[in-house]
Amino acid sequence: MNIEIVKKQMERLLKYAHTPVFTVESCYNMAYGSISMASNIALELGDCQLSIAIDRLWDDTYRELFLNAYREELAQQ
């Protein structure tokens, strides 16, 4: 596992959040669950640095992107 795999998954879920088929809230929940699992798997494999990088990826980037998408969805309602 590496950080690029996690980034691809987050980008995929972020794209889904902008489609009418999925709600942003459900994509946010899937993304948060995926990030948490990836971070825990990295810890289980003994790669603390990767786990920290995954957590920071969520905290510094994708959390805010999903929240912005959610705000956009609310503004359209």
What role is predicted for each listed range?
Residues 8, 48, 75-76:
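Intrinsically disordered, low-complexity regions enriched in polar/acidic and amide residues
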Residues 65-67:
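Alpha-helical linker/edge segments of TPR/alpha-solenoid repeat scaffolds
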Residues 1-4, 70-77:
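Short intrinsically disordered terminal tails
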Residues 21-62:
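Acidic, low-complexity, intrinsically disordered interaction modules
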